[in-house]
């Protein structure tokens, strides 16, 4: 049998934003129900608008107990009710934007544009970075970095973390309004809907949440949404949603390294697989590619947002 020995060029690229203005992600929270006729008519307008603004708009749909049957409400009635009541939702559909632009109605592109642009004009005092990782078995690990740029003024600030299912599809309508497709459905809040106290002093704060995927949830559709909200006036200061660490990338430690590094792969030369370690001092979009001796790209091992930390992955030349 012919033995092949491989020696390849491995390139690590990290794109980070340094000393730039913090980007606002605008949070749209809707109350809806699978047996609500106006919801069936209005939701497509909101969903279409959101899909055209994915870069800076985040949505969570809370399913109410009324006016009729809704299995997404029944899956977590207590927390769904708590968020609906917190948002002063007394009729469906109701859409609030960043907690302080209340009850957009009717649902129109112009109304959503106006609310969105109004909030984008407000510079956020903090940023949130969320990275999700599937844990073998039945869990998701969410690593969150909260950066408070300046000391916050007086207020009651809460840091809230929620599991959201991006898409739920039924073969037949689960309620009476004919809808079979539901987007960004609220599933559960951690540790609860109250959240935890948000630090008000400028600095960087790290959080890790590991939660189980419940039986009804579709694994690949779950994403973590995190936001900071002032309970005094319900304003959302900023929000973000998780990006996933690709399968096969191991986060060795979340300890921030002293400097960026791409270690020599081992073994080298190798046949047919090798391990690659790298370190990031800041979170950013990370690309890790393998090239042959002729400069041709052989494989793209990483192409995603990663947080600061040390990582390891494997390249297998046999495919």
Predicted regions and their residues:
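C-terminal outer-membrane/trafficking sorting elements
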Residues: 253-319
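Hydrophobic alpha-helical segments, especially N-terminal targeting/anchoring helices
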Residues: 16, 229-230, 291, 295
């Amino acid at each position: 049998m012919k033995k092949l020995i491989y020696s390849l060029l491995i390139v690590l690229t990290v794109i980070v934003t340094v000393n730039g203005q913090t980007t606002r992600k605008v949070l749209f929270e809707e109350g809806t129900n699978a047996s609500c006729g106006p919801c069936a008519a209005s939701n497509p307008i909101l969903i279409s608008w959101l899909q055209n603004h994915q870069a800076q708009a985040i949505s969570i749909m809370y399913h109410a107990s009324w006016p009729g049957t809704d299995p997404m409400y029944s899956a977590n009635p207590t927390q769904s009710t708590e968020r609906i009541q917190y948002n002063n939702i007394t009729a469906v559909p109701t859409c609030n934007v960043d907690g302080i632009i209340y009850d957009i109605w009717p649902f129109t592109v112009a109304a959503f544009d106006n609310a969105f642009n109004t909030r984008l004009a407000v510079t956020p005092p903090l940023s949130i970075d969320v990275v999700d990782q599937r844990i073998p078995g039945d869990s998701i690990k969410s690593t969150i970095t909260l950066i408070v740029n300046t000391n916050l003024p007086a207020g009651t600030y809460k840091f809230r973390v929620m599991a959201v299912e991006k898409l739920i599809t039924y073969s037949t309508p689960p309620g009476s309004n004919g809808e079979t497709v539901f987007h960004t459905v609220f599933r559960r809040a951690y540790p609860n809907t109250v959240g935890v106290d948000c630090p008000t002093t400028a600095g960087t704060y790290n959080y890790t949440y590991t939660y189980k995927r419940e039986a009804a949830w579709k694994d690949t559709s779950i994403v973590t949404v995190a936001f900071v909200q002032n309970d005094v006036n319900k304003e959302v200061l900023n929000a973000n949603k998780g990006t996933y660490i690709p399968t096969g990338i191991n986060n060795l430690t979340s300890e921030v390294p002293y400097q960026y590094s791409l270690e020599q792969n081992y073994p080298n030369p190798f046949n047919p697989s090798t391990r690659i370690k790298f370190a990031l001092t800041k979170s950013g979009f990370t690309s890790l590619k393998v090239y042959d001796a002729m400069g041709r790209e052989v494989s793209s091992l990483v192409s995603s947002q990663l947080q600061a930390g040390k990582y390891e992955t494997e390249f297998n030349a046999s495919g």
